[in-house]
């Protein structure tokens, strides 16, 4: 038995921003719907839970920084991811109405393409939709496995020390008030700490899924524009005045839709620039500290950080892949126009084609401070983390 969204019979319309809606829905944040008091209270609890556990991780790491740097690193590594996720959760709630409006506009634009009854568009749409949902849920699943790995580590350590004096340790390296590390409150705070790991997973999977989904949905709309350019500029020998006029109108519609896509991407950049920048910076540090922890630890402790590193790397890869896919499809508009039979049309049509080619030379990208997410940026991030690890090895 596997999840319904993996089935080929699952309605295509439900795939649109599925990961974002599902992940944030688990936290009580609903986009485009009226927020009930129950959902709002659940959202506030999750936010406070994550903030409180971030503070507990920081206290643990700071208190062990001089006496046990290895344990301090074990606390600071998840803390970087948790604190970033806390920022993302607050940011997405603050911009929730803009996010909902953006989702509705994309739904309308894609709905216009669905009315075309074009097999090429249907195949491309299904391909992009399934990729967004499956890759987003892959990160969601990997994050849950990471939380499970930390919990299993904690339970295993309890089992190994069962004949010794019992240590009331949390699944993550957290230091609460003294009563939380004693019975009868210990089981409650143990679950409280574990849940903060899942809040982290749901929030970062929802935010990352929103970015990845948006870029691939835009890539689909740009691909649909490419099909329209190819259809509008089909080779016709001696086109009539009426045919030239129709072609010019179709090209004008293509330009308008291209402008609309660029406008939406600009608005999206305004919403996601801050969380994306913070994510890339923190992900670089998290990957580096995870690799350092792998070098410092031995035995079963390595497994959880291998999974953790793979999860964070997968999330940042989706950002970069989505940005590259969108910019590539944007550049392909100019290639499609140039490869068409534009030379057989009249002067006005050729002029419009020339303008499309010039416009397409400037790719559409999500603007983030200092960079635009792309596969070369992913390579740079990995190199940067490698430099941090090399520096840490010389110090440690």
UniProtKB/Swiss-Prot annotation:
Q: Cytoplasmic topology: which positions? A: 1-39, 95-135, 222-276, 323-369
- Give compartment(s): Cell membrane
> What are the record keywords, sorted?
Cell membrane, Membrane, Olfaction, Receptor, Sensory transduction, Transducer, Transmembrane, Transmembrane helix
Primary location recorded for the protein, binned into one broad class = membrane
Pfam families listed in its UniProt record: 7tm_6
Q: Which InterPro entries match?
A: 7tm6_olfct_rcpt
Q: Name one GO cellular component term.
A: cation channel complex
The membrane-spanning stretches of this chain are 40-60, 74-94, 136-156, 201-221, 277-297, 302-322, 370-390
Could you list which ranges are Extracellular topological domains? Answer: 61-73, 157-200, 298-301, 391-396
Membrane topology classification = Multi-pass membrane protein
**GO MF terms, alphabetically ordered:** ionotropic olfactory receptor activity; odorant binding; olfactory receptor activity
Q: Does the keyword Transmembrane apply?
A: yes
Query: Its Gene Ontology biological processes?
Result: detection of chemical stimulus involved in sensory perception of smell; signal transduction
Misc: The atypical heteromeric and topological design of the odorant receptors appears to be an insect-specific solution for odor recognition, making the OR/Orco complex an attractive target for the development of highly selective insect repellents to disrupt olfactory-mediated host-seeking behaviors of insect disease vectors. Odor-evoked OR currents are independent of known G-protein-coupled second messenger pathways.
| Family listed | Belongs to the insect chemoreceptor superfamily. Heteromeric odorant receptor channel (TC 1.A.69) family. Or1a subfamily.
Q: How does it assemble?
A: Interacts with Orco. Complexes exist early in the endomembrane system in olfactory sensory neurons (OSNs), coupling these complexes to the conserved ciliary trafficking pathway.
What's this chain's function?
Answer: Odorant receptor which mediates acceptance or avoidance behavior, depending on its substrates. The odorant receptor repertoire encodes a large collection of odor stimuli that vary widely in identity, intensity, and duration. May form a complex with Orco to form odorant-sensing units, providing sensitive and prolonged odorant signaling and calcium permeability. Involved in the behavioral responses to anisole.
Q: What is this protein called?
A: Odorant receptor 45b
């Amino acid at each position: 038995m596997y999840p319904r969204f993996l089935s080929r019979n699952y309605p295509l319309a439900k795939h649109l921003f599925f990961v974002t809606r599902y992940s944030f829905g688990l936290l009580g944040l609903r986009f485009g719907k009226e927020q009930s008091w129950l959902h709002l209270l659940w959202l506030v609890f999750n936010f406070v839970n994550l903030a409180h556990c971030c503070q507990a991780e920081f206290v643990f790491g700071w208190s062990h920084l001089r006496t046990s740097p290895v344990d301090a690193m074990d606390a600071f590594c998840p803390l970087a991811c948790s604190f970033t996720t806390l920022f993302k959760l607050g940011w997405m709630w603050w911009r929730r109405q803009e996010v909902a409006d953006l989702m509705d506009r994309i739904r309308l634009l894609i709905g216009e393409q669905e009315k075309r009854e074009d097999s090429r568009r249907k195949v491309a749409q299904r391909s992009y939709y399934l990729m967004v949902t499956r890759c987003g849920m892959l990160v969601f699943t990997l994050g849950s496995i990471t939380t499970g790995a930390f919990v299993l580590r904690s339970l295993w350590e309890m089992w190994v020390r069962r004949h010794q004096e019992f240590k009331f340790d949390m699944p993550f390296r957290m230091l609460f008030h003294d009563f939380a590390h004693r019975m009868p409150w210990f089981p409650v705070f143990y679950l409280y700490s574990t849940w903060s790991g899942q809040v982290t997973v749901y929030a970062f999977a929802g935010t990352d899924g929103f970015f990845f989904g948006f870029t691939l949905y835009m890539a689909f709309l740009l691909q649909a524009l490419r099909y329209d350019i190819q259809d509008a500029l089909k080779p016709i020998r001696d086109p009539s005045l009426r045919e030239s006029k129709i072609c010019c109108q179709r090209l004008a519609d293509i330009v308008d839709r291209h402008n609309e896509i660029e406008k939406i991407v600009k608005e999206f950049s305004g919403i996601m620039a801050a969380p994306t920048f913070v994510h890339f910076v923190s992900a670089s540090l998290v990957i580096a500290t995870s690799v350092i922890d792998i070098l410092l630890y031995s035995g079963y402790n390595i497994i959880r950080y291998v999974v953790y590193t793979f999860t964070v790397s997968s999330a940042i890869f989706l950002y970069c892949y989505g940005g590259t896919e969108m910019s590539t499809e944007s550049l392909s508009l100019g290639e499609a126009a140039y490869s068409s039979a534009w030379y057989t049309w009249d002067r006005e049509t050729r002029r419009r084609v020339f303008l499309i080619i010039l416009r397409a030379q400037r790719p559409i990208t999500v603007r983030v401070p200092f960079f635009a997410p792309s596969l070369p940026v992913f390579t740079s991030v990995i190199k940067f983390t490698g430099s941090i690890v090399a520096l840490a090895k010389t110090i440690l």
